[in-house]
Amino acid sequence: MSAIAQKWLLRAAPWFLPVGIVLFWQLASSTGWLSSRILPSPEGVVEAFWSLSASGELWQHLAISSWRAVIGFSIGGSIGLTLGLISGLSRWGERLLDTSVQMLRNVPHLALIPLVILWFGIDESAKIFLVALGTLFPMYINTWHGIRNIDRGLVEMARSYGLSGFALFIHVILPGALPSIMVGVRFALGLMWLTLIVAETISANSGIGYLAMNAREFLQTDVVVVAIILYALLGKLADVSAQWLERSWLRWNPAYTAQEAKA
């Protein structure tokens, strides 16, 4: 096999399983083995997608969900990054913050929904708050972990060359912690959509989650499947975006350089 063919095969490999599942799904539906009352056929899902797209309803819900996700991630990610930096750079910061953050991290989002509705109602603030809360913790943990696992030899070497304070942070500590921070970004982006699903299915009047719950009330399983697939694709898009940022910001890192060479 030529190098070019092998390269294209490796790029297509992640899609073999999804395509195989869809083909099996279509075969089971067309032969009657899988009832449409249980799961609509892929053809029916595509028809529902085109119908929602043509009416513009799908894009309205998608735009609203995307806006909530981006705003919530921006707020929660920024707070998590800031708290992680404080806790990672300062022993006193860790003593003050870490225990409280870890306790809050273990509280399920579903348990907070009654309080969130009481505090914010069912407007946008409630959904954004839940998304921000969900994305805060992975950013905090990975930022703290990245700073605490920096090679101390590099820090001492930088200090011997006269770096200290902000210069030491910018040139040594932040670049050293960045790989772990980017892992936090990828994890937070995944939790962003998971949290939004919870928020939109319980306390919303718009968005992809609301579309799915509304379709469930009328037994429109094809629309429910469209919403599920959309969430999966949005999650994949967020992960691909995070990978692109990793490649762009970590070109200096030998591990990422080796990955690009293999790709």
Model segments located where?
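Transmembrane alpha-helices
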Residues: 129, 133, 166-198, 222-225, ...
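Glycine-rich helix-loop "coupling/hinge" segments at transmembrane-helix boundaries
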Residues: 117-118, 147, 194-231, 250-260
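N-terminal signal-anchor/first transmembrane alpha helix
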Residues: 1-29
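Short cytoplasmic-facing helical segments at TM-TM junctions of multi-pass membrane proteins
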Residues: 99, 142, 146-184, 212
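C-terminal transmembrane helix and the adjacent membrane-cytosol boundary/short C-terminal tail
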Residues: 91, 148, 179, 183, ...
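Periplasmic/extracellular loop-to-transmembrane helix junction in inner-membrane transport proteins
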Residues: 3-4, 30-75
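Generic hydrophobic transmembrane alpha-helix motif, especially the helices
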Residues: 102-138, 145-146
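Transmembrane-helix boundary motif in ABC transporter permease subunits
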Residues: 71-101
